[in-house]
Amino acid sequence: MDFYRPLLRPLLLSQLNVDPEWLTRNALGFLATLARSRSPLAANLRSYLRQTYGFQDPRLAMSLWGLTFATPVGLAAGFDKDGIAAPLWSDLGFGFAELGTVTALAQPGNPRPRLFRIPQDLAAFNRMGFNNASAEALADTLRGYFPEGQRSIPIGINLGKSKLTPLSGAVSDYVSSFRSLRSLGDYFVVNVSSPNTPGLRSLQAVTELEPILAALQAENTEQRPLLLKIAPDLVDEEVVAIAHLAQRQQLAGIIATNTTIDKSLLSVEHLPGRREPLATEAGGISGAPLRSRSTEVIRLLHRTTQGQLPIIGVGGIFSAEDAWQKIVAGASLVQVYTGWVYEGPLLVKTIQQGLLERLDSAGLPNLAAAVGSAAIDS
């Protein structure tokens, strides 16, 4: 039985003055307690989660970068920043989980309130600012959870720049985080696309980005898959330039996309509980308003690289159809966060069941055969 939709979702969508960050922090805290506990009750609860939310079919399995993804649906970065619930994500049906964003220096993030739900648009608005306990703290957490290095699903780690580090020191800042964590993650993501760290998006310019990627690859002696997460607000020419740079630097893939700063996508004039005009609010939008543009970027990346650069698609996935559209546009894997919060934990299982139905309808043998099948030029 799923308790989320009848009990927790109404609270999320209500007009009560409930801080979304408080809800998220407490939900994550419960999962972290469950992950740490060795009690029989915790074991029974985890077994219940696996039975309720788990779903696997070999036709959905994907192999990338020497890793096996039993299911193509992963948890996007931003929810479990410090990895405190890392062992639990497989219990909830995810095929992989991306932790972070973490930075070299611990930082509190931006002032509260900094996370808002906008139910009428099925959206979230955040200006969290990479609040995290530091890359070294995440390393300690992962060593504690996985002392032998064995994880039930691939774990990705999303790396950002510390707010106190000037843009001129970005290279050493990213390298410092990577050094702390490089043996503890299955893949790594360079995040230069959050709108909530001053100047960060300027690092998406090829001339700024290339030294960062080159330094990380030089440090990448264990040959961990290194990916880049990009913004949906780039113009197509910038997306193409980044795709070529990614290939030149032999990146493992691209994650498309991060949040958007295009406030015209929202129907509201003010954020919940705020009087300031929306146009003056700093932050990024995730959820349904991002769906179309993120899929467009995926399609453009797939065409530009002729399908040679794996893509993880994220942005506005609330259903199997949303995930399918990103896959046929060129995504090999997909991630959820905002849609997962709105729809509940069963979303992951529902997506997988729906993907199988679409494979059958299309007469395709497996999900790999669907990747990019609708990305051809019209």
From Swiss-Prot:
Leading EC class: oxidoreductase
Pfam families xrefs: DHO_dh (PF01180)
Statement: the UniProt record of this protein carries the keyword Transferase: no
UniProt topology in membrane: Peripheral membrane protein
GO BP terms in the entry: 'de novo' pyrimidine nucleobase biosynthetic process; 'de novo' UMP biosynthetic process
Intrachain S-S bonds: none
List of residues binding substrate: 81, 126-130, 191, 196, 258-259
Subcellular localization: Cell membrane
Alphabetically ordered keywords of this record: Cell membrane, Flavoprotein, FMN, Membrane, Oxidoreductase, Pyrimidine biosynthesis
EC number: 1.3.5.2
Cofactor note: Binds 1 FMN per subunit.
Active site: 194 (nucleophile)
Binding locations of FMN: 77-81, 101, 158, 191, 229, 257, 287, 316, 337-338
Keyword Oxidoreductase attached: yes
GO molecular function list: dihydroorotate dehydrogenase (quinone) activity
Catalyzed reactions per annotation: (S)-dihydroorotate + a quinone = orotate + a quinol
GO cellular component, one term: cytoplasm
Pathway participation: Pyrimidine metabolism; UMP biosynthesis via de novo pathway; orotate from (S)-dihydroorotate (quinone route): step 1/1
Cofactor(s) needed: FMN
Sequence similarity: Belongs to the dihydroorotate dehydrogenase family. Type 2 subfamily.
Quaternary context: Monomer.
Role description: Catalyzes the conversion of dihydroorotate to orotate with quinone as electron acceptor.
Protein name: Dihydroorotate dehydrogenase (quinone)
